Amino acid sequence: MISPSLLILYVENPAASGRFYEQLFGRAPVAQSPGFVAFRFESGLGLGLWSTGSPEFVSSGTGHRSEIAIVVDDDAAIDALHETWKAAGVAIEQPPFTAVFGRTFVALDPDGHRIRVCPPDK
């Protein structure tokens, strides 16, 4: 069986994006180079930030077509994280609201990738 273990976001400045996610996640990257920064989580999932300026990066796509979802326990945790990120200067695209799947909000990273905070699937 195939099991995804790494998500990659293509970013203009991996070092700046790495600092952003380090603050957001409260953890240091596990790997860094001029064109790539990587984080690893207890679940085994990894997040890679790869430079769009890298000679290995080839894409005919345009725009931001990705969203990271961070699942938290309940509505209070969603609202608390929103306030923490807002106070830290994180760009908020959608303030907390109740969608069909529950309370949620969406923040943006420095490259405009969406970061959704939401409850677990039920």
Where in this protein do the model-derived segments appear?
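Short alpha-helical
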Residues: 15-16, 76
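Conserved beta-strand-loop-alpha-helix junction that forms the acyl-donor binding cleft
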Residues: 11-13
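Conserved active-site tyrosine of GNAT-family acetyltransferases
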Residues: 17-22, 85, 112
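Vicinal oxygen chelate
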Residues: 1-5, 27-75, 79-108, 119-122
